Amino acid sequence: MLTIAMPKGRIFEEAVELLRRADYMLPPEFEESRKLVIDVAEENMRFILAKPMDVVTYVEHGVADLGIAGKDVLMEEERNVYELLDLQISRCHLAVAGLPGVKMNGIAPRVATKYPNVASTYFREQGEQVEIIRLNGSIELAPLIGLADRIVDIVSTGRTLKENGLVELERIADVTSRLIVNPASYRLNGEVIERLVDRLAAVIPQP
């Protein structure tokens, strides 16, 4: 049985739709289930529903053979997993944002984010020294209350930035969800996993 870890929410919904297009027989009530572990005996699959950051942990430690994770998580975590396929779902991007017309001041201006590794790498590559402040939610609040000069966050439609009076200043990277695999699982179940990859690849919408 293949075990696949997936994040709850938008990625889960789009991934389930993709699996169905690839002719995987998932039950109609699959999306409505409140279970965190769902077995689909007909396809010899088990699904684990988790928080996005935890999906990569489950795959790295072999609790799940495969996982679906956003490229933003993979960039931030840098875990020991293989990236097999760009699923082209949950499209968004990582960006630097802030209040319009406000310049970064001081020797090491502050940047708030839940992606400290991504932010540190980006500003270092830009030749800018910054102080990173890690937050876990409501990142847009940081410039409004004077906690930070800039934020680094995921942007989808830009609506949240606009509603909080912020503007996108720099685009860091495009983000889509990826199919990842545990290296040991790939060696042991390579043939089965490759069949899954081929079926998904055949139905992925091209950008």
From Swiss-Prot:
Family the UniProt entry places it in: Belongs to the ATP phosphoribosyltransferase family. Short subfamily.
GO cellular component annotations of the record: cytoplasm
Name of the featured protein: ATP phosphoribosyltransferase
Organism of provenance: Geobacillus thermodenitrificans (strain NG80-2)
Keywords assigned by UniProt, alphabetized: Amino-acid biosynthesis, ATP-binding, Cytoplasm, Glycosyltransferase, Histidine biosynthesis, Nucleotide-binding, Transferase
One of the Pfam families matching this protein, by short name: HisG
Signal peptide: none
Gene that encodes it: hisG
Coiled-coil segments: none
PANTHER family given in the database record: ATP PHOSPHORIBOSYLTRANSFERASE (PTHR21403:SF8), ATP PHOSPHORIBOSYLTRANSFERASE ATP-PRTASE (PTHR21403)
Role description: Catalyzes the condensation of ATP and 5-phosphoribose 1-diphosphate to form N'-(5'-phosphoribosyl)-ATP (PR-ATP). Has a crucial role in the pathway because the rate of histidine biosynthesis seems to be controlled primarily by regulation of HisG enzymatic activity.
Subunit structure: Heteromultimer composed of HisG and HisZ subunits.
EC numbers on record: 2.4.2.17
Biological process terms in GO annotation: L-histidine biosynthetic process
